[in-house]
Amino acid sequence: MSNIYIQEPPTNGKVLLKTTAGDIDIELWSKEAPKACRNFIQLCLEAYYDNTIFHRVVPGFIVQGGDPTGTGTGGESVYGAPFKDEFHSRLRFNRRGLVAMANAGPHDNGSQFFFTLGRADELNNKHTIFGKVTGDTVYNMLRLTEVDIDDEERPRNPHRIKSCEVLFNPFDDIIPREIKKPKKEKAEEEIKKLKPKGTKNFSLLSFGEEAEEEEEEVNRVSQSMKGRSKSSHDLLKDDPHLSSVPAVESEKDDATGDLEDDAEDDSVEHDGSMEEDEKNLMRERIAKRLKKDASANVKSAGDGEKKPASRSEELRKEARQLKRELLAAKQKKESATKAEKGSEEEEAVPDGPVAEYRREKQKYEALRKQQPKKGTSREDQTLALLSQFKSKLTQAITEMPENCAEAEVEDDEGWMSHVLQFEDKTRKVKDASMQDSDTFEIYDPRNPVNKRRREESKKLLREKKERR
């Protein structure tokens, strides 16, 4: 990567984008792409990019934003028209973290820009590169891709630019424009206020006088009961059919309903479903208790709302207690049935592999119950077992006879006294002076012995020639 940075020209200008994925530092090539950098810096100074979304995300390729409409077709430059492309021979799409202008064709640059997520040689000489993401903020840029994307490369929950900050402005002559926001139309509420309210003309009705009297009565009652809950006692005070005693039993009914619901929910959580007879028994006990205390609750209804609340709590506690008792009885019954079934099975199969399997199972279940839980006691037990094994191993080694000629018995403890023995394969040392079938013939003409032999053989040949 070092050769890439050496090839790229030095930057001149810096902007900080504060996004929902984190801050992103962008250094600008204002000398190589002056129009694009001036356009980008001025839009940042004018808060043009604030609250805009990254409307296009292509994993491994680009992340595009800068459109105030969020559609991918909006946005305009500070020049009032699209400006020309600015290509440079030392700026190429050869890595991630580059910032370039988005366009729909040649010389069609506006306000939209994109970040590269990898090498993209197909974009060279098509899009103007004007900056790069620096430092650790490149990882915040990569977080922009961690969103759900639909078939049209649009994120369902897109990240957005919260604000922009120009840290270093190489263009001192930039004057931010005052962007006039369009005046909002009057709200619907104001329009409704301007509309005149309709008046009811009861003279047009055949029963106009009666309707007018009912309307006045309703208005008067609604004004008097404004801000309070309304009931038949408030509206019909002179009705002789209504009782003057508050209906406290309704609260009790609600309490019983809540108790039944709580009991049913808890029973579903613990055991799945309770039997119908158990539910009926619980309902009867709660109903009896409610009947006993109904008169006392009616008398003490005027004392306040704390007593009914406390009473309902007591009823809930009693319901929970009943539920626990029923569950305990049911569990006891199930355990008894299981024990009976197990005894019957044992009697049915007195002997054989099944009985042996059951005995082994009971043995290991008893050992598992004796095993302590995790903690210091479990660690102490493990160390004790290890020391016991070591002592057993040393004892087996010491008790082994020196000359064990008998065949070893294969059992669980036989391996402890086993001795590892290897076949004796000693090799003979080769002696150069000894001739053997395995001796290799080595001839060196520079050896003095070989030289003497050659001279002697030559001498013998000369003597033979002379004799002839």
Swiss-Prot record:
Biased composition annotated in UniProt, kind: Acidic residues: 256-268
Alphabetized Pfam families for the sequence: Pro_isomerase
Keyword Iron among record annotations: no
Residue span, PPIase cyclophilin-type domain: 11-166
InterPro entries: Cyclophilin-like_dom_sf (IPR029000), Cyclophilin-type_PPIase_CS (IPR020892), Cyclophilin-type_PPIase_dom (IPR002130), Cyclophilin_A-like (IPR044666)
Phosphoserine found at: S273, S343
Taxonomic superkingdom: Eukaryota
Protein family: Belongs to the cyclophilin-type PPIase family.
Function according to Swiss-Prot or TrEMBL: As part of the spliceosome, plays a role in pre-mRNA splicing. Probable inactive PPIase with no peptidyl-prolyl cis-trans isomerase activity. As a component of the minor spliceosome, involved in the splicing of U12-type introns in pre-mRNAs.
Subunit structure of this chain's protein: Part of the activated spliceosome B/catalytic step 1 spliceosome, one of the forms of the spliceosome which has a well-formed active site but still cannot catalyze the branching reaction and is composed at least of 52 proteins, the U2, U5 and U6 snRNAs and the pre-mRNA. Recruited during early steps of activated spliceosome B maturation, it is probably one of the first proteins released from this complex as he matures to the spliceosome C complex. Component of the minor spliceosome, which splices U12-type introns.
Protein name in the entry: Spliceosome-associated protein CWC27 homolog
Organism whose genome encodes this protein: Rattus norvegicus
